[in-house]
Amino acid sequence: MTDYAGQFNPGFRLEAARVALVVVDMQYASASRHEGLGRLLKDQGRPEQGAARFDRIDSVLVPTIQRLLAAFRAHRLRIVYLTVGSELPDYSDLPPHMRPMAEAVGNTRGRREHEILDALAPRPGEAVLNKTTMSAFHSSGFERLVRAWGVDQLLFTGVSTNSCVEGTARDAADRGFRCVLVEDGCGAASAALHDAACHNFQRLLGRVDSSARVLAELGAA
């Protein structure tokens, strides 16, 4: 059945001078099957509960984000990395709904778990902003930075599609940014969660598109 919402979301074209690539929370705490959440699940004897998440990260997200980073760097386009985690050893700066997981996986600044995956590591001079909430708009200088760049189009990648990615993208849309969830650049705990977040986002909030299409549209393929 056709969704009536489509008529209210006419879409937009990406422009290289106005766009930034946003890499969300691709850290050892949440994006590695060997550290952080992956290690916790293994130690608990239930690694299969993370299998779908980490299989997609390893086989789809990392290669996709690597291609996007390479293209954006080659064309000197804007890149910003977001991380999530505590700035304090007692995790007291995190809201109650985020603190238990951060504590369980050791996600605090200065620990390996807080670092971005080596395969996606930022280069010198690239922006890395930490947040202590799911949305970067509430606990970092993200909005101030991208507005200073003259950016009003944002390409979102990373984890998890249904939490920090969608949370930041929703807030961006409410602030007038034109947003794209890069479908093959995002992932969640399950395909169902990822697909639901993508479906919901594209109804009224922005676009959901493939990395190949956005790079072609930007002339950066």
Regions found by a protein language model. Give the residues of each.
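A solvent-exposed, charged loop/short amphipathic helix patch at secondary-structure junctions
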Residues: H34-F54
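Alpha-helix-centered segments that form part of catalytic cores
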Residues: D55-Q66, D118
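Short hydrophobic beta-strand that contains or immediately precedes a catalytic carboxylate
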Residues: V22-V24
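Short coil/turn segments at secondary-structure boundaries
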Residues: A52, R56-S59, A104-T108
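A basic- and aromatic-enriched beta-loop-alpha substructure that forms the phosphate/nucleotide-
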Residues: V80-G85
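Active-site-adjacent betaalpha module
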Residues: M1-A20, H34-G38, Q66-H75, S86-D90, ...
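Short acidic, Gly/Ser-rich segments with clustered Asp/Glu that frequently serve as metal-coordination loops
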Residues: M26-H34
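Surface-exposed cleft-lining segments at the edges of enzyme active sites
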Residues: S30, A51-I57, L155
